[in-house]
């Protein structure tokens, strides 16, 4: 049962930096610049600590990809969001619905909360 295991660990190394940006004390970065570099590279960290780096050139190439120009296959139809707003009911019909909604009625003490047949 006792067998020799040949498990070896690789020493961890830091990600090499190619460019350092020195900021003076008191210099505030705008919120949009927190995860970017002066060269346009975007970087992020997952909750597990994995570092993700997106090169600007790669992102610009993805923008022109045919995949970005087609919607997902099983996308639901939501008027005004995933389909043009031409499917909406006329404005007059929507206003009539809003006028007759029970929420707009004034709450009086003599009206019961609901009706019940006994």
From Swiss-Prot:
Which keywords, in A-to-Z order, does the entry hold?
A: Acetylation, Cytoplasm, Isopeptide bond, Nucleus, Phosphoprotein, Protein synthesis inhibitor, Translation regulation, Ubl conjugation
Q: Where in the cell is the protein located?
A: Cytoplasm; Nucleus
Q: Where is this cross-link: Glycyl lysine isopeptide (Lys-Gly) (interchain with G-Cter in ubiquitin)?
A: 57
- Where is the motif named YXXXXLphi motif mapped on this chain? 54-60
The terms under GO molecular function for this entry are: eukaryotic initiation factor 4E binding; translation repressor activity
Q: Where is this motif: TOS motif?
A: 114-118
Residues found modified as Phosphoserine: 44, 65, 83, 100-101, 112
Q: What GO cellular component entries does it have?
A: cytoplasm; cytosol; nucleus
Which modifications occur after translation, per UniProt? Phosphorylated on serine and threonine residues in response to insulin, EGF and PDGF. Phosphorylation at Thr-37, Thr-46, Ser-65 and Thr-70, corresponding to the hyperphosphorylated form, is regulated by mTORC1 and abolishes binding to EIF4E.
Which Gene Ontology BP terms does the record give?
Answer: negative regulation of translational initiation; TOR signaling
Q: Which residues carry this modification: Phosphothreonine?
A: 37, 41, 46, 50, 70, 77
Quote the record's domain comment.
The TOS motif mediates interaction with RPTOR, leading to promote phosphorylation by mTORC1 complex.
Role this protein plays = Repressor of translation initiation that regulates EIF4E activity by preventing its assembly into the eIF4F complex: hypophosphorylated form competes with EIF4G1/EIF4G3 and strongly binds to EIF4E, leading to repress translation. In contrast, hyperphosphorylated form dissociates from EIF4E, allowing interaction between EIF4G1/EIF4G3 and EIF4E, leading to initiation of translation. Mediates the regulation of protein translation by hormones, growth factors and other stimuli that signal through the MAP kinase and mTORC1 pathways.
Summary of subunit composition and partner proteins: Hypophosphorylated EIF4EBP1 competes with EIF4G1/EIF4G3 to interact with EIF4E; insulin stimulated MAP-kinase (MAPK1 and MAPK3) or mTORC1 phosphorylation of EIF4EBP1 causes dissociation of the complex allowing EIF4G1/EIF4G3 to bind and consequent initiation of translation. Interacts (via TOS motif) with RPTOR; promoting phosphorylation by mTORC1.
The protein, known as: Eukaryotic translation initiation factor 4E-binding protein 1
